[in-house]
Amino acid sequence: MSEQANALLLDIGNSFIKSAHVKISERVFEQPLIVTRCNEVSKLREQIKASQRVVAAAVGQGQQVKLLESLCAELHVPLILAKSQAQAFSMRCAYRNFSTLGVDRWLAVIAARRISNTDAYCVIDLGTANTCDVVIGHQHLGGWIAPGFSLMRDSLIKNTELVFANDDFPNDLTLGEQTVDCVNMGCAAAVNGFIYAAEQKMRERKSEYTVIITGGGQELIKKNAPKHYYFHKNLVLLGLLEYLFT
């Protein structure tokens, strides 16, 4: 395959679509991803047209996926839709019914192996939902799914009398002195507790491990984070790079 061939990577999420153009070569993992965002697949026509291959991941988003399939067929550009697998890229999935593991989690687990400084690591994705996935060696051991910061806050406001909040997104954890702050800080504390519990599980298995944090909510815990925390904004796209060589 020519080193000049282009591939378009797509992470089709709930809020927006992340895209990155890469040159297909063995050195692609060493190069930084230049990521752009849009909210509709239809806006990607020119990027697709300029590519020799499209590699995409989507959790749900059926209409967007159908449109992507149609565009790629029209422009005669091969499309690979990543799926969770029982075993791939030397990683074994913990789920018996592996197809029910979100492909975003699967790709993040695969990508994190290239980042982690240790054999054991956990991937924390902070978003609408917070997820945790634990890996030792080439084995995904499973994980957790919990409400994310905004979901917790909205649920408190909706289901609890005389509790209210604002749209502030705290980047430090302090004690609230009014209800608004108590709600925001309490939800932030819950996120921190989620990560703390994940670390406890890691310590039960390995003395040395890495915590890799991704997702839009990572700003909540970046300040004063321990040295063994590694932050990455685009783990799903990084995981999609593996599909360029299958």
Swiss-Prot record:
This is Type III pantothenate kinase. Its EC number is 2.7.1.33. GO terms for molecular function: ATP binding; metal ion binding; pantothenate kinase activity. Catalyzes the phosphorylation of pantothenate (Pan), the first step in CoA biosynthesis. It catalyses: (R)-pantothenate + ATP = (R)-4'-phosphopantothenate + ADP + H(+). ATP binds at D11, I12, G13, N14, S15, F16, I17, K18, T128. The active site is at D104 (proton acceptor). It is found in: Cytoplasm. The gene is coaX. InterPro entries: ATPase_NBD, Type_III_PanK. Keywords: ATP-binding, Coenzyme A biosynthesis, Cytoplasm, Kinase, Metal-binding, Nucleotide-binding, Potassium, Transferase. It is an enzyme of class 2 (transferase). A monovalent cation. Ammonium or potassium. GO terms for biological process: coenzyme A biosynthetic process. The lineage of its organism: Bacteria, Pseudomonadati, Pseudomonadota, Gammaproteobacteria, Alteromonadales.
